[in-house]
């Protein structure tokens, strides 16, 4: 027997130390609920679970992002629904105005409502917002830039590629104009119509009675009112009268029939039939810096020029877009370069990782892009044209709403997928990180018994050297 080294006590102490360490870890696992509380518990498992934790947090936020995207789309779609209702009302008013039973005053009243609804559509375009971000003014659509202020892209279809485009403007759009010859009648406010000069003046089907005794200002007011009905501006110079249509293009016309006894005093021709002209644009030959194809076609309506091609390609320009014109004015022919690029779409982060995004594009929706900014229903012809214009506008708004609906459906499916992925990844992380409570309780019980036994055995081992005393005492 040896007393300098108590090997039994050393062994019991070592075992007790290991048992206490294991017992401490078991207590930590049971109290935290985690199998891995530090990297030393499972280095590989710790690395994997931390990556999973990052992904799970990202998936949760991506799901919320997609839900926010749905809210944006619902806000825009709700505004467009109201725009569609207004367009339906405007079309109904056009049908009403086209009826021959209406008087000029009736059509003026109809036009008053049309003008107010047009202004309201413009207001909706400018003020529909989500979280201070304007939705319908084109800010979250693709952008286009040109190298001149005289031509700009008003609208383009989704099939227009991001590229450079070149056109040549060969003629600007013009208004119909009738300029009277000089007449002393317009020079003085004291001028009056004599009985021999009285007669009738017809402007685009609106007849005016010029009576004896009418002063210059009374005559001008009658002419101005008739012109206003027909969307024509009347201006009185120092000694002559000028009539100019408000609209541009071949559809803008001034037809005048003037009694012979009025022609000299008013300075107007006995008859006149003037029309405006449409803008003329030529697409430059396809080249490296021009994305138009050889099959693209061009049509003009006043200042608006539409380029169409295969695959529902459509691009609408406005020529003479700078009003007042630039100084010095740019006169045709001249070349315009455009660039279309993805600079504006709203990018939604709908995934946990970089690049997992979705672009949402909402085009500009206002009277100009809908083609209804200058609808005039004060004549039957204008009312008939209004029906066609509002039909086209309703179709366009419906198409935009359909696209927004497709966006919303996609986002709803994205949310479902994100939530399922989140669920499965959380379950996988749980299998790696979480402790099996039943198994760990059994382990804890075992270690606890061993600790108690180890403590007892260590005490016994420490008592063994005492037996040497009995030998010495014997």
List the predicted regions and their residue ranges.
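Primary detection of the long, small/polar-rich alpha-helical "axial" segments characteristic
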Residues: 1-474
């Amino acid at each position: 027997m040896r007393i300098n080294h108590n090997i039994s006590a050393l062994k019991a102490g070592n075992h007790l130390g290991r048992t206490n360490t294991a017992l401490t870890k078991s207590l930590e696992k049971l109290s935290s609920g985690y199998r891995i509380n530090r990297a030393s518990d499972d280095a590989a498992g710790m690395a994997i679970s931390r990556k999973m934790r990052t992904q799970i947090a990202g998936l949760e936020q991506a799901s919320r992002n997609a839900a926010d995207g749905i809210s944006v789309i619902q806000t825009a779609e709700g505004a467009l629904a109201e725009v569609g209702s207004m367009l339906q009302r405007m079309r109904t008013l056009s049908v009403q105005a086209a009826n021959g039973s209406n008087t000029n005053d009736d059509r003026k009243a109809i036009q008053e409502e049309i003008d107010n609804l047009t202004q309201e559509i413009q207001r909706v375009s400018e003020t529909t917002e989500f979280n201070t971000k304007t939705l319908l003014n084109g800010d979250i659509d693709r952008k286009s830039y040109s190298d001149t202020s005289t031509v700009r892209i008003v609208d383009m279809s989704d099939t227009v590629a991001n590229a450079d485009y070149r056109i040549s403007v060969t003629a600007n759009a013009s208004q119909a104009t009738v300029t009277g010859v000089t007449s002393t009648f317009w020079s003085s406010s004291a001028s009056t119509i004599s009985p021999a000069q009285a007669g009738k003046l017809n402007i685009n089907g609106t007849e005016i009675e010029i009576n004896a005794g009418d002063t210059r200002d009374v005559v001008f007011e009658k002419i101005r009112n008739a012109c206003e009905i027909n969307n024509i501006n009347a201006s009185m110079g120092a000694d002559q009268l000028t009539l100019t249509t408000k609209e541009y293009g071949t559809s803008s016309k001034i037809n005048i029939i003037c009694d012979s006894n009025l022609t000299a005093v008013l300075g107007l021709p006995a008859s006149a039939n003037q029309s405006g002209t449409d803008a003329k644009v030529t697409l430059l030959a396809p080249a490296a810096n021009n994305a138009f194809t050889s099959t693209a076609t061009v049509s003009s309506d006043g200042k608006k020029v539409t380029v169409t091609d295969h695959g529902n390609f459509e691009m609408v320009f406005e020529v003479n877009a700078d009003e007042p014109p630039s100084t010095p004015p740019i006169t045709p022919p001249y070349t315009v370069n455009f660039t279309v690029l993805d600079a504006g779409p709203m990018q939604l982060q709908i995934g946990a990782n970089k690049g997992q995004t979705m672009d949402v594009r909402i085009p500009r929706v206002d009277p100009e892009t809908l083609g209804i900014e200058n609808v005039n229903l004060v004549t039957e012809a204008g009312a008939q044209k209004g029906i066609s214009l509002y039909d086209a506008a309703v179709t366009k708004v419906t198409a935009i709403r359909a696209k927004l609906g497709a966006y919303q459906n996609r986002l709803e499916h994205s949310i479902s997928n994100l939530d399922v992925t989140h669920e499965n990844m959380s379950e996988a992380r749980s299998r790696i990180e979480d402790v099996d409570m039943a198994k760990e309780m059994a382990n804890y019980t075992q270690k606890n018994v061993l600790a108690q036994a180890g403590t007892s055995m260590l005490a016994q081992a420490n008592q063994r050297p005492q037996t040497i005393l009995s030998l010495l005492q014997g």
